[in-house]
Amino acid sequence: MFRMPIVTMERVDSFSAAHRLHSEKLSDAENKETFGKCNNSNGHGHNYVWKVKLRGEVDPTSGMVYDLAKLKKEMSLVLDTVDHRNLDKDVEFFKTTVSTSENVAIYMFEKLKSVMSNPSVLYKVTIEETPKNIFTYKGC
């Protein structure tokens, strides 16, 4: 039995957002010790890079794993929730979850999964907070 080839594809986009690393479960002193300058009461921002990787069989009719134009639109729906926002104040998820880049990766994965026409091909998302700080989430 012939099996269709498995291919990964990746789309990259970016967004700018502000946040403050602060946990309500920690005292002010513990927050300062844990998060350092990222606990600044006025917050700070990043120009994030968001990479989305899909993995699946190549459709014999379209020759694609997933329609890139469709993925671009779906990613745009997610980007609209975070781009030029204060994550802690403007995104419901982060009102109760510390806005670490680990949690940003989880949020972006789950949010994208919820709007994709075929979420089964979503393999992983990567958030680059800086060129040296990179976080990847593959889902549960």
From Swiss-Prot:
Record's catalysed reaction(s): 7,8-dihydroneopterin 3'-triphosphate = 6-pyruvoyl-5,6,7,8-tetrahydropterin + triphosphate + H(+)
Domain of life: Eukaryota
GO biological process: tetrahydrobiopterin biosynthetic process
EC supergroup of this enzyme: lyase
Active-site residues, Swiss-Prot/TrEMBL: C38 (proton acceptor), H84 (charge relay system), E129 (charge relay system)
Cysteine-cysteine disulfides: none
Record-listed E.C. numbers: 4.2.3.12
Coiled-coil stretches noted in the UniProt entry, renumbered to this chain: none
Cofactors: Zn(2+)
Listed Pfam families: PTPS (PF01242)
GO cellular component, one term: mitochondrion
Subunit-structure text: Homohexamer formed of two homotrimers in a head to head fashion.
Family according to the record: Belongs to the PTPS family.
NCBIfam families xref list: 6PTHBS (TIGR00039)
Protein name, entry field: Putative 6-pyruvoyl tetrahydrobiopterin synthase
UniProt organism field: Caenorhabditis elegans
Recorded name of the encoding gene: ptps-1
